[in-house]
Amino acid sequence: NAQSHDNVVSIMLDTKGPEVRSGDVPQPMLKEGQEFNPTIRRGVSTQDTVSVNYDDFVNDVVVGDILLVDGGMMSLAVKSKTSDLVKCVVVDGGELKSRRHLNVRGKSARLPSITDKDWGDIKFGVDNQVDFYAVSFVKDAKVVHELKEYLKRCNADIHVIVKIESADSIPNLHSIISASDGAMVARGDLGAELPIEEVPLLQEDIIRRCHSMQKPVIVATNMLESMINHPTPTRAEVSDIAIAVREGADAVMLSGETAHGKYPLKAVRVMHTVALRTESSSPVNTTPPAQGAYKGHMGEMFAFHATIMANTLNTPIIVFTRTGSMAVLLSHYQPASTIFAFTNEERIKQRLSLYRGVMPIYMEFSSDAEETFSRALQLLLNKGLLVEGEHVTLVQSGAQPIWRQESTHHIQVRKVQN
């Protein structure tokens, strides 16, 4: 179904990761000051005691720890523990539902980042040719290298997005993002494991790091949380989307709003509308941001100057790419208009949909440059994405040109004619 519409919709498989969850409970209402006890004994479900799915849970917590339930919706203070039970007092109460996520503030569970279940899901992704993996609770770069080695052995061309949601990941941010193909700011668990006032600063930092390495970055969790139950968002949620867009996120993501919310389509429309409006109101700088990690690279120089030209002349950019690299470089500089990225590789088309400002389009390339240019312009005219008489900036750069064997680089401006 993802490929049934003219829009390019990529598929990302989100691994479950090493989550610690409570078992099934009779939905008790936890009240401040009452005793409540997680236990590693299986099948326990009473008003004051519930099983957890992690055998080392008792060993991981110490007296004085704060347990956060369901992303911090409720909290428990650890008072004492036995060999199989943690005795707690409720600090912030609420209704406890079955299979809620448990975090220890400031700590991560000593579990492998990729569980046995995750490996099964990853194999499913290989068999079904998903476009991205989102790997949960990544603590260091080792797990990214491990997954990439597995994908290499499987001959699977799938990119790895790391979810930054663990306290242990923060000291290793640079190496984790460097090893990955992109990052997701998963603010729910990040705000549970770290003080919540740190989350906006970390969001900005992660976006900045990804930009410097020319990796895509997604901002996720609680963006339109109120729309799970209500048809309109809070004004703070609207501002949250706008801030993520202004900070330079490549994508913003919904989860509970569309997974089990009452208004999934409305939530998507709100997010889409706010993101577009925010982008349209952003000031256009003729000179793009400073060059990034590959500033000595010929391709980066061309992307930089193509962006200056497009912004100065107020034109969209058309790029022809086999590998996607030039489209990625152009996206890094965030030109004011759309980047139409033509590629003759389906996998590249799917991958480029994640990058900010890029509209990927599949098209077979001709060995003749003029024929290729003309076909691309006609296709955009037919789709209503260009109008006759406007100008476009054409970019072709790289060691794998689209119409001959030797390396070629050029930028040109053309007037669209039918």
UniProtKB/Swiss-Prot annotation:
K(+) binds at D14, T15. One of its GO terms (cellular component) is chloroplast. GO terms for molecular function: ATP binding; kinase activity; magnesium ion binding; potassium ion binding; pyruvate kinase activity. It catalyses: pyruvate + ATP = phosphoenolpyruvate + ADP + H(+). Its main location: plastid. Substrate binds at G188, D189, T221. Its EC number is 2.7.1.40. Expressed in developing and germinating endosperm and in roots. It is found in: Plastid, Chloroplast. This is Pyruvate kinase isozyme G, chloroplastic. The lineage of its organism: Eukaryota, Viridiplantae, Streptophyta, Embryophyta, Tracheophyta.
